Every structure is written in C-alpha cells, then in structure tokens.
Amino acid sequence: MQFVRYERNGALRLGALEGNDVVDLLDAAPNGTAPGILAAFSDMTLLIAAADAGLAVARAALKAASGAARTPLAKTRLRAPIAPSLILCSGENYWDHREEKPEVTRKDPEFFLKTSLGVIGHGDDIVRDERVTQKLDYETEMLIVIGKAGRHIPAARAYEHIYGYSVMNDVTARDRQVTLRPDGSSVYNLGPGKNFDTCAPIGPAIVTADEIRDPQALDLRTYVNGELRQSNTTGKMIWTCAQLVEFFSTFVTLQPGVIISTGTPGGTAWGSDAELGGKKPMRKDVVTASSYLQPGDEVVCEIKGVGRLVNRVVAA
C-alpha cells in the first residue's frame, strides 16, 4: 500500500493511494472497525504501530471504498506522509559521493540527526534564505520507515522491523556544513549544515515494505529544472538498509515511525565546488552539477517504485 497525509477543509487526513485517487481511510473504514484502528486511521505513526492489524483493515477499506471516500489525487493537497519523531541520517553511503568530497576515512556509517521541524511535503516550497546559506544543495535519499520497535537488531532480522520506504531530499547548506582549513583539510559542522526550515522534504507517500521486492535494486535520480543531476541505484550503497538498521539500533531503541535516511550518491553541486573542497568523482557516468539551487528552481527526487518528490525553491 501507499499511504499519504493530505489536507481537507484545513485538517490533516490519512489516505491511501489507489490509481489516480486518494482514499480517505476514516471515511472508508468498514463498519465495526475497532476504536483503536479508527484512531490509527487519523495518525500515520499510530497506523504504523498498529502493524498487521492496521494494514489488514486499511486494505479492506481500500477494497470497499465508495466514491464518497475518494478524492482525485490531482485535486489533493498532499502533506509530508509522516511527522517523524526522529530522523536518523547516514552520510557518505555511496562511493561516488565520497569521491566528490574532501577525503575522509570512516569505518562506520556517518551518523547525524535532522530536525523534524524542517519536514515539508510534496509540492511544498524549499526556502532559500541567504541569511542561512548561499550554497543550497540537494540530496535524493531513500528513507527507511521503522515499523517494529527494537534495540541491537541484527542485520539478518532488520526487515522484520521495516514498515516501508519513502523519499527525502536532504537539503543542505554547504557553506554551513563545510569549512576548509588553511592546509586544505576540512571541518564538518552537520548541525547548521543540515538543520533549518524546509530542510527535509519527504514524500509523496510511504510505500509499505511488501510493495518493494528488493530495496537494494532501485534506480535513484535527481533533476533540477529537468536537468539530470544524480543517477544511481540503491544497490550501490556502501551499507545496506539492513546494515543501517543494525547500526542505528546499537545507539537508540528504534520506535515505530522513526525514519532512517540512507545517504545520497554523487552528483551534488558540492562536487563541482572547489572552494569547499569538492572534486569530480572518478566514475565517468556521474553527472556534474552546474550550480547550487536558486529561487525558481524545481527539484525532482525520484526513486523507482518508491515515489517522485517535487519541490520548488523560493527566496525567503
């Protein structure tokens, strides 16, 4: 299934995509649906926590949905599919992205957090605030949505804890993230570089894990104004989805609704920015970006089978 949150009469509603329609789960809920499931049909995190029972009723609702429970997707204002309690991020998870950055040595995934205050949805505007950054960059990333709580989860059992997947643009202020020392080495400051208003577009939907046959075999692309900027496959991750679940669960108990961002491939604007230590990757098929994001740009983050996230950049 594909779950979305959308706006209706000023209120957030939870729906499921079917063809060109959004089916409102509360409106379509079968008679006699348990109160706990009805409550879950108004909150994505509660629906995730309802696990198989919630999914079973959601499927029944979708199958029986009448016209009154349906809204054409084209007439729907989508919001981010979830308001995550925690966004765990892994950087440097594709070799070609590592190659376009100042040299680093790392044996574990890069670990940083992103604020949920920066979450926006499909169709919302990314704000380029010059007081924050002059070098606003894009990063298409696949999101893992945790469905079952766990700590110290072995990679071999990680998929038991994954509810589904989505798309995130890890919007980054490069001139806040990276400072070059006089000797040419770099200092990373991921706090201000990764956390500001509208820094985390997510969506358009959460796709349940049963819809994705192999999360390590999905084409990933980024377009800016129709120009291809990133092109890779999730199969080129250094650490797989299962390994990232194992890694992050070492530190915190993963709860339903927590999301893990799996990193971005090469092709960022940073890779063409010598002032910040950027360098072209050795792979000849990596796209070289022409510039950082500017007001008026349209950014498309696309992962096959997971979704196509579109946002426009505006000036503050």
List where the protein language model places each region:
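Structural signature of FAD isoalloxazine-binding scaffolds in flavoprotein oxidoreductases
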Residues: E103-H122, Y138, P295-G305
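Catalytic-pocket segment enriched in acidic/His residues
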Residues: N9, A60, T71-L73, R77, ...
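N-terminal non-catalytic cap/leader segment that marks the start of a structured domain
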Residues: M1-E110, E298-E302
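N-terminal accessory regions of nucleic-acid-interacting proteins
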Residues: R151-S166
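Residue-level recognition of short, solvent-exposed, well-ordered loop/turn junctions
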Residues: A83, C89, E139, L254-Q255, ...
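Generic beta-strand structural signal
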Residues: S85-L86, D108-E110, T115, D124-I126, ...
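Active-site glycine-rich loop that binds ribose-phosphate moieties when present
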Residues: V119-V132, V145-I153
